[in-house]
Swiss-Prot record:
Species, as recorded: Enterobacteria phage T2
A Gene Ontology molecular function term of the record: DNA binding
Transmembrane segments: none
Protein name: Nucleoid disruption protein
One Pfam family here: Phage_T4_Ndd
GO terms for biological process, alphabetical: symbiont-mediated perturbation of host cell cycle progression; symbiont-mediated suppression of host DNA replication
Entry keyword set: DNA-binding, Host-virus interaction, Inhibition of host DNA replication by virus, Modulation of host cell cycle by virus
Biological role: Disorganizes the host nucleoid and inhibits replication, but without host DNA cleavage or degradation. Only the architecture of the nucleoid is affected. May act on the host chromosomal sequences that determine the structure of the nucleoid. Binds to dsDNA but not to ssDNA.
InterPro entries xrefs: Phage_Ndd
């Protein structure tokens, strides 16, 4: 099993939405409409811009549809409150993390289509079942990749 990298995220179509440090936005806060989108949010440390740099993904979080529309802001609140070992690590290590967003509709290359060529990927099923959950996709990510700060 390999570590997920920025290249994997870029190939799937992820977008950078900002940078956090200690559970707070660093260098500007994205608009609430961006932060409330359901999907997956990936944290990457040391995104330094070197041409051959391909840092590993430190952690992943998913956000479903919420009536409150808190989205990723709720994740940041959990980090600031240090509600888990992962949250305590991110809150206390003084490391800036670049936040990538990927909607569930673009998860196929990282889940059911992982490790397949372009032709095979075209014939791999999409995630569109009414019973397909973000939790299930999260487990598929854990089956296919390792993350620096997460064991599962």
């Amino acid at each position: 099993m390999k570590y997920m990298t920025v290249t994997d995220l870029n190939n799937a179509g992820a977008t950078v939405i900002g940078t956090i440090k200690g559970g707070e936005w660093f260098l500007g806060t994205p608009h609430k409409d961006i932060l409330s989108k359901p999907g997956f949010y990936f944290l990457v440390s040391k995104l330094d811009g070197r041409p051959f740099s391909n840092p590993c993904v430190s952690a992943r979080f998913y956000v479903g549809n919420q009536r409150s529309k808190q989205g990723f802001s709720a994740v940041l609140s959990h980090i600031r409150q240090r509600r888990s070992q992962l949250a305590r690590t991110i809150a206390n290590n003084n490391v800036p993390y670049t936040v990538f967003y990927l909607p569930a509709s673009k998860m196929k290359p990282l889940t059911t289509g992982f490790g397949k060529g372009q032709l095979a990927l075209a014939f791999t099923r999409n995630h569109h079942s009414e019973y397909q959950t973000l939790e299930e996709m999260n487990r598929m990510l854990a089956d296919n990749f390792k993350f620096v700060l997460q064991a599962y």
